[in-house]
Amino acid sequence: MMSIRQRREIRATEVSEDFPAQEENVKLENKLPSGCTSRRLWKILSLTIGGTIALCIGLLTSVYLATLHENDLWFSNIKEVEREISFRTECGLYYSYYKQMLQAPTLVQGFYGLIYDNKTESMKTINLLQRMNIYQEVFLSILYRVLPVQKYLEPVYFYIYTLFGLQAIYVTALYITSWLLSGTWLSGLLAAFWYVTNRIDTTRVEFTIPLRENWALPFFAIQIAAITYFLRPNLQPLSERLTLLAIFISTFLFSLTWQFNQFMMLMQALVLFTLDSLDMLPAVKATWLYGIQITSLLLVCILQFFNSMILGSLLISFNLSVFIARKLQKNLKTGSFLNRLGKLLLHLFMVLCLTLFLNNIIKKILNLKSDEHIFKFLKAKFGLGATRDFDANLYLCEEAFGLLPFNTFGRLSDTLLFYAYIFVLSITVIVAFVVAFHNLSDSTNQQSVGKMEKGTVDLKPETAYNLIHTILFGFLALSTMRMKYLWTSHMCVFASFGLCSPEIWELLLKSVHLYNPKRICIMRYSVPILILLYLCYKFWPGMMDELSELREFYDPDTVELMNWINSNTPRKAVFAGSMQLLAGVKLCTGRTLTNHPHYEDSSLRERTRAVYQIYAKRAPEEVHALLRSFGTDYVILEDSICYERRHRRGCRLRDLLDIANGHMMDGPGENDPDLKPADHPRFCEEIKRNLPPYVAYFTRVFQNKTFHVYKLSRNK
């Protein structure tokens, strides 16, 4: 399969406009230029410098990632088919629709081909705009047609440069979020440096370019930055409206570009629910954010031709349940501590029950089964019952859906990110507990949320939001490695904010009786500067070596297969095989598929299980009948799957099929007592012997070191 081989030779103190001056900092303020005009100029200068650095660091990150991609594959030198093969698995499937739109004679015909597609799933016509999140490919194809770039920029470069450009926006949004939280752009600079030096754990865009998360996460970061600003107290009405607009647009674009949007926003809704229940942010602002989430999802639902999976999402059920519970349960935030605690537990129970009730009702009305594999996976993952379900086990056995590896923390510690994160997290968690206890105890408190009596600890609403956000997404990342990119990028933001926060250093210095306004200033600037110098000293040489290392794409077997398909099979031929390979077949050859990697449809999952019987212990006539039921003309067998050794016993694809079919697994090891020996040998092995029962149904037409292609007989 595809591999990579070595290429052949051929400072001043800043003042934030939104931070109210504290009495302890009066002396520091007096050192700033005096007079209203001077302060305004100083503020403008700070914003200009910080904004310029934000744009520069974002662009540099984008160029850095694009250069790594070029150096790793020699993308500018390889053939078109090799470029397309480099878009592995589902990435190739998504890119194929961009290519399809560009190859259509007109935009109208391109849209029609997506809405009435009969090549992605054989013998079926499906609406791709309803089934998949591919509006970004549609939009990009329209831009490429309209803009005057066709003469000097190939379509594939227009596509990948757009994704790398979004990475610039992503890093800039992280920078701004940290700046908003701490009040200094130095914090944003540190967050960006940490993002780059921890690249292995913060992004995978350079080798999975078309992946949905690479489109979605930049908009998610913009949304978090906008929410952080929105939760500040005493915003001007115009600022508040503009911020709400930014939140809505970023939430909508995030929802439109990733099929897992509803689960990420459910985590956000849980953050809002927690803070609202503990009186740590204004209820009216939480209501606005709940409403924006629902509105964005419903708008996406309309654009996706009323995709039932969106309507049946837990997020919509949860947010509606919160609104209903608020109406039913009055005076939630009054009474003594025990009284309020009891009301809070009752409120939590009511919202949970309403959420499950509404979700079940909606799913029964819509007859929705598209997301049941996710809940089967979660049930098995958290030990709520063993399962032999093929789909659930397919996820359980993938490393990306396993627990976060322990060596991740070693890499994060090398850059000091993990140590700084734990330091800041520990302090803010303690403060959050104190503030929550105070809020629950003091029901007569008439002060605004986030403010407490002078001399007590304080946690601003925007800080509280980012604290609970990082905790919940941390649990998500620890349980599912694929979701670590949502957490590690926010780790950079949260850790850098804490090291540059005057409130954090004030609390820490007061606790050890070393408080002094000058010391706060010294600590909040010297610590991040020292860390930046350390990062430059330790990682700059390695980054330069990485940029100078030249490799090239090398996958001759797959290239040979794609060229053979293009030259020797009819345009309307139907191909069966593994999901990952068939995505490449569609992109490189345009042939019709039996199945594909977009696994969010129940009928497709059933079809995939049937096609995968080519790797199970089944009779040739049974496999032939299953494949022909989907109109299959050719089947591609892969030695890397048939003789797989990458996964442990019980997690190889052939083992999952054996268990699902009730057959004993191959090789030494235990089997469940009720599993029985199969009546037939493994199909993918036995077919290569060219025995009469197999030759009667299958004729080998292509073979190399990796792939075997068989043509199915039609008269059986």
UniProtKB/Swiss-Prot annotation:
Q: Which InterPro entries match?
A: Dpy-19/Dpy-19-like, Dpy19L3
Q: According to the lineage, what is the superkingdom? A: Eukaryota
Keyword Transit peptide part of the UniProt annotation? no
Does this UniProt record's set of keywords contain Glycosyltransferase? Answer: yes
Cytoplasmic face: residue ranges?
1-43, 183-184, 198-215, 231-239, 280-289, 324-338, 438-465, 500-522
This chain belongs to the protein called: Protein C-mannosyl-transferase DPY19L3
| Intramembrane stretches | 185-197, 216-230
